[in-house]
Amino acid sequence: TAGNTGIGLTLIANAKGYHSVIVMPETQTKEKKDLLKSMGADLRLVPAKPYKDPGNYVKYSKTLADEYIQKTNGNAIWANQFDNIANMLGHYNSTGKEILEQTEGKIDAFICSSGTGGTIAGVGKALKEFNKDIKIILADPKGSALYNYIKSKELIMEGSSITEGIGSSRVTANFAEATIDDAYSIDDKDAIPLIFKLIKNEGLNLGTSSGINIAGAIKLGKEIGPGKIIVTILCDLADRYKSKLFNKELLKEKDIPIPEWL
């Protein structure tokens, strides 16, 4: 995990009396690492490596799970976050239906980013079953290959982003379930200032994935015009990224406008 799903799984494991082992790339923020440790997770940090490398965090977690399964006589499971479509089904059975209830079915488009891929796939499936004309759009950070995959069926990565846990160099089993009409490639220079604006003007303390989602929703709104209902997901908090989001040196280096209060 890049952290957030691991945090959720650790809380569930604690409540169920299970031991949780969380594998994460060492490049993720200190805040997420500290939170996992404080909740009692057995945190294993590994160097960030491409998916094809056997040392990649997903591959390593599978190797580790196999060892635990053998050691415990089958009394362990590999959550397999990215390719376990329980994630997509969870959003299909809950989030998608909740959106339809709250909008009374009057929704023109849904847009969000993809990390595991379950949100866009599950919500999209529920919405398309209700009305096939509802547009499902991907908001993809720079440095991810999914934008080009939707546009041309080629996994090509361009640029970079300070966001974590969204974007991918591959098509996960969850993402493969998605029916996506279009995609936007979102620059940090458009997304991050929106996070600061929402803190100041709306009292919303949101994280980087939410910033990408909101920037995508605004772009979509400008494209399809007034009088439409667009839904996105505010899925993370700024607290988990403060060492990046509120790091003046990093923002300056990435040419992202620095909020006046920093």
Report residues per predicted region.
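Alpha-helix C-terminal capping segments
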Residues: 6-19, 37-39, 122-131, 215-225
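Glycine-rich beta-alpha junction loops
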Residues: 82-86, 115-118, 140-145, 170, ...
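Buried hydrophobic positions in well-ordered alpha/beta secondary-structure cores of metabolic enzymes
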Residues: 3, 13, 36, 79, ...
